A protein has these predicted regions:
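Structural recognition of alpha->loop->beta junctions
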Residues: 36-46, 115-130, 190-197
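Aromatic-lined glycan-binding groove of carbohydrate-active enzymes
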Residues: 122, 154-171
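Long, low-complexity, intrinsically disordered polar/charged segments
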Residues: 112-148
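Active-site cleft segment of glycoside hydrolase catalytic domains centered on the general acid/base Glu
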Residues: 7-91, 95-113, 139-153, 178-190
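Structural recognition of the beta-strand scaffold that forms the well-ordered cores
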Residues: 1, 46-50, 92-95, 127-132, ...
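Substrate-binding cleft of secreted/luminal carbohydrate-active enzymes
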Residues: 133-134, 165-176, 183-197
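Catalytic metal-binding/acid-base residues of hydrolase active sites
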Residues: 54-55, 99, 132-134, 171
Length: 197
C-alpha cells in the first residue's frame, strides 16, 4: 500500500464565554480596530465619525451590536477614549446620522441630542454631529415653507447644544414635479443656499 491519506473531521466545539469574558474580548478587538484606524490617519486626519447611525431601527446580520456585549453607553465611551488615547493631537469626534425627507427632522434631532447627552460624562466628550442630509424641494409653496421651517428648527436645536455641526452626503431632490424647469432649478439652488447658511 502506498500514498494513503486519511482525514478526520471533528465536529465544532463551542466554548461559551461569560458576559464579562465576551466584553473583554470585544473591547480588545475594538481597541485594535479604532487604534489602527486613528493611527493610520495620523495628524493629517483630525475628525472622525466615532458612531454612525445610532438611531437606525433596522438591524440585520451585517450589523454588529457592540452595545449588546459592552453596554449601550459604555461601548461609546470606550470608543471615544480609545480614539483620543491613540493620538497626541486633538481629535474632533462626531456622532453621525441620516436625516431623510420622510423624517420629522426636529424630533429626530432632539432624539439624537438626547442620545449623545446620555453618552457623555466627565471623561467622554463628543465634539459634534455629522448630519447625512437628504432633503426634498417642493414646488408647492406651503409644503416648501414647512420644509424650510423644519430644517431651520433642526439646525437651531443642534446649535443650542454648542457642539459643531457638519453636513455630509448632502442630497436634494424635487418632489411633485414631472419635469424640472429653469425656475425650479433656481429655486432648488436657493433652497440649497438657505440650508447651508
Amino acid at each position: 500500500l502506498d500514498n494513503i491519506e486519511m482525514h478526520w473531521k471533528q465536529s465544532d466545539k463551542i466554548i461559551e464565554k461569560t458576559p464579562e469574558e465576551k466584553a473583554t474580548i470585544i473591547a480588545a478587538e475594538m481597541e485594535k480596530w479604532i487604534g489602527a484606524t486613528v493611527a493610520r490617519g495620523g495628524e493629517a486626519v483630525a475628525s472622525y465619525n466615532i458612531l454612525s447611525e445610532p438611531l437606525a431601527e433596522q438591524v440585520d446580520g451585517n450589523t454588529f451590536d457592540w452595545g449588546a456585549f459592552m453596554g449601550e453607553t459604555d461601548y461609546v465611551r470606550a470608543a471615544v477614549q480609545m480614539a483620543r488615547d491613540t493620538v497626541s493631537h486633538n481629535l474632533n469626534l462626531y456622532v453621525s446620522n441620516t436625516f431623510a425627507p420622510e423624517d420629522d427632522v426636529v424630533a429626530k434631532a432632539d432624539q439624537l441630542i438626547a442620545l449623545v447627552s446620555s453618552f457623555e460624562d466627565s471623561k467622554t466628550v463628543i465634539d459634534g454631529y455629522n448630519i447625512l442630509l437628504n432633503v426634498k424641494y417642493s414646488t408647492d409653496a406651503a409644503t416648501q415653507l414647512a420644509n424650510e421651517t423644519a430644517i431651520s428648527n433642526m439646525f437651531k436645536a443642534f446649535a443650542a447644544t454648542g457642539k459643531k455641526v457638519r453636513i455630509s452626503n448632502f442630497r436634494i431632490g424635487v418632489a411633485d414635479a414631472q419635469s424640472i424647469s429653469a425656475d425650479v432649478r433656481t429655486a432648488v439652488a436657493e433652497y440649497c443656499a438657505y440650508i447651508l447658511q
